[in-house]
Amino acid sequence: MSWQTYVDDHLMCDIEGNHLSSAAILGHDGTVWAQSPSFPQLKPEEVSAIMKDFNEPGSLAPTGLHLGGTKYMVIQGEPGDVIRGKKGPGGVTIKKTNQALIIGIYGEPMTPGQCNMVVERIGDYLVEQGM
């Protein structure tokens, strides 16, 4: 299965009539493996800050999480495993696997819990596959 299939069929899937607004799978170096059409272009320093927070949990909290120039307030995640951000009624979930970052961005009417479920399910599957 191609990385684009993971994004199209598994991250952008329909959940109770809702779906993520955008999603992507990136390498730890920020290289895009696959993305939805509306996924923002990430800056190298944004990817570096995300990777730093996975290695040093809490480092993003003072500055916020930035994706494509959009700032999200960092909320409760799972140190070293999942970063979650909030902006208004929407937000983002980032799951780190051995080789990839799985990123899902959502807005209303999708809920944070639905986004977490979609992103973390794919991330957990990839970890099980050694990815």
UniProtKB/Swiss-Prot annotation:
PROSITE patterns reported in the protein's UniProt record: PROFILIN (PS00414)
S-S bonds: none
Annotated InterPro entries: PFN, PFN_euk, PFN_sf, Profilin_CS
Gene Ontology CC terms: cell cortex; cytoskeleton
Record key words, sorted: Actin-binding, Allergen, Cytoplasm, Cytoskeleton
Localization of this protein: Cytoplasm, Cytoskeleton
GO MF, any single term: actin monomer binding
Keyword hit for Cytoplasm: yes
Top-rank taxon: Eukaryota
Cytoplasm in keyword set: yes
Summary of subunit composition and partner proteins: Occurs in many kinds of cells as a complex with monomeric actin in a 1:1 ratio.
Family assignment from sequence similarity: Belongs to the profilin family.
Reported function: Binds to actin and affects the structure of the cytoskeleton. At high concentrations, profilin prevents the polymerization of actin, whereas it enhances it at low concentrations. By binding to PIP2, it inhibits the formation of IP3 and DG.
Protein name: Profilin
Organism name: Chenopodium album
